[in-house]
Amino acid sequence: MIMKNLHISMAFIFVLLLITASCSDKDDSAPRIIPTMNLTVSEIADNTALITSEQQTGTTFGAKVIDFYPVADIGFDYNIEVKLVKFVEENGEPVSLPYTRKVTEGLRPGVNYISAIIAYNAEGRAVCSAFQTWKAAGTEGAWSDGGSAGDL
């Protein structure tokens, strides 16, 4: 009889432990908000551009940005997010959101550029990204790498 009561008591305690372990103070029914962000390149004129980005949903803890990079120099399909995220992680500059920068140097007229940004979660993993391709204003081929004005 004592053995039977002991088994019943142990089974009851086991069930209570299972119930307690499955309940937590976190509300699992709360919707998880996936972080999203945007990136916009505007005011493209006379070798300048305005690059802006902001968090739209969710929470992030830091970001990296590539303000402009020639599309012709990218050796992969930037539409594949995993490759783009890795590229920004390796080549980007740490920034905070919201982000705004007026680019006034380094653009070549007529060149297609990509601007890209990624944001990180609390564990340091990239959780969202955004990019935009755009063409620098001006006349293509007007840039000279040499010290001369070219053939006039």
Give residue spans per PLM region.
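Sec-dependent bacterial lipoprotein signal peptides
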Residues: 1-21
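Bacterial Sec-dependent N-terminal signal peptides
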Residues: 17-46, 134-151
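Structural beta-strand segments of beta-rich domains
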Residues: 47-51
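Acidic, Ser/Thr
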Residues: 54-58
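Recognizes extended acidic, P/S/T-rich segments that occur
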Residues: 64-108, 122
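Beta-strand-rich modules
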Residues: 104-128
